[in-house]
Amino acid sequence: MKKILLTGLAALFLLAGWFLAGRDERPAPALPDDPLEIGVEADVEPFSYVGLRGELTGFDVEFAREVCRELHRECRIEPMAFAALLPSLKAGELDLVVAGLAETKKRRVDFLFSEPYYRSGSFFVTTQKRFEHFTPDRIPELVIGVQEGKLQDEYVAEHYVPRGARKKTYSSFDALVDALLSGEVNMIFLDSVPGYTLLNHPRGEALFIGGRAENDDAEFTACRVAAKRGDVPLIEGVNRTLHKLQSNGKFQDLIIRFLPFFSF
């Protein structure tokens, strides 16, 4: 069954590649020759982290490098706290942010977004078995940790704090996990891709999934690259890179190499 599914996926990717290749026959717009300054989130596996040989790697990092290759520009990849990424892009310190961003009405005021390059839901993780399947009446017992500036931060503030939960924010993924393991919070709410990576890591041996977001709609799960509003040629270059990688199989290679599951 798995072999049939993967073969079917490969066929779909190939057909998509033929379609997209035809769509992209028009000449690409001229782009500057200076280096591309690309922001990624620091220290969050499997997206951006320091490998065993001391090199910066990860799904977002390698996708960013492919964008630079497609646009024939030198790459300067800047790992930073997630909450600093969009302000740095808005200030002109970055050209792109490759960090699995959701496109929201608020963000569209200042930024332009690519097509989704992967999809990911969100779930709660806990150390306490009693919260593994919590019900709405237990929400006032929750102290929920979230990462500052992420969509999960906004979601908890909107859906759980008004119902009695307490929210604590942390500047990094590691700080968020440390807060859960130390008992500072009894639940964290995070992206499912690094969440599954955590659960398969020795640090996650005593952790449980404590439920999913109540509303995993398309806006909440589609993950995109961002540029400054108006930078259409650059976003078109990102989309062109995505189409090319999907059609030649390299994107699937990146998924198999870094992600715990197919995520489209």
PLM regions and their residue ranges:
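Hydrophobic residues within well-ordered alpha-helices
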Residues: V67, L89-K90, I139, L180-L181, ...
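Flexible hinge/capping segments at coil-to-helix
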Residues: T126-I144
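Periplasmic-binding protein-like
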Residues: A42, Y118-T126, N200-H243, L259-F264
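Beta->alpha turn/N-cap motifs
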Residues: G39-V44, E78-A83, G92-T104, T127, ...
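Ligand-binding cleft/hinge of the Venus flytrap
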Residues: S48-G51, A64-R73, T135-R138, L151-S172, ...
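Ligand-binding clefts/hinges and TM-proximal coupling segments of bilobed small-molecule sensing domains
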Residues: L15-G22, L151-Y170, A206-G210, N239-F264
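A ligand-binding cleft/hinge motif common to bilobed small-molecule-binding domains
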Residues: A84-P87, G100-D110, A157-E158, S182, ...
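Extracytoplasmic small-molecule ligand-binding "clamshell" domains
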Residues: D24-L101, V109, T169
